[in-house]
Amino acid sequence: MEDLPPDYQDQDLPSYETITNTASTAVAPPTRSTLGPATLYISGRFIYSTDPQAPPLYEFSHSIGYLHENDRSVKVERVDQVVKTSAGISQVVLRNRHLFDLKHPTAAEFPNFAYHAEAATRRVLCSFGASTFRVGGILRHGKGYRFERAVKGADRKLEAQDALFEVNPSRDKAVGYEWRDAQGELIAREVKDEMASMSLVITAEMSAEMRDALVAAWIIRIWCELSNGDHSAMRLMMVRFKTVNAVGYAP
């Protein structure tokens, strides 16, 4: 069994939902098992949707465009919106939920994965590791990425289990990579917009936990490119202007 922190208690936040708190009661939110298609983009340490009025969806401990080979750990948090009611006045506040720690161990640690994501709570889908493979032939070749569910073995290192995602370069020049799930179904594409920044266009419905894992895997793939000197990944530092609302999050 993999060691994980204790599960969240009742006072912690539900996934992608709001909860109304009063001085005496807390009303449980309705469940939402599936999230629809969406487009996500990176701005500094944050991931946003395309809604210009919305707060960030995820926050990272590092600015994503500046990740490099010497970085060893990146904290991934989801930014949840919570509605609090006090004295009859409702207020929306943001709270961060720690999801994953993205890891890049040194070669001296003899890791099974050069990059992996460790679950920070039992509420995420799983821990998983990343590996690469070559695709294409003599005239056209590239690098693909494979993400596998992982658990800690007897040596405390993550060991590969079932497939989670597979990522391949796209034949479409406007698309960088295509993401498929364990069943081989297309679930997302990485595309370049008019500002040459990279976005993840999620085309399939999925659970909130699956989307959290997909976002974490996306950042691992980008981190791997940046660590290997892929200059095309530096376009991540070219981001669109984002109107910052009163909560104080800035790109």
Map each language-model feature to its residues.
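Short acidic, low-complexity intrinsically disordered linear motifs used
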Residues: 1-26
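Cationic, beta-structured binding surfaces that engage anionic biopolymers and membranes
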Residues: 20-244, 250
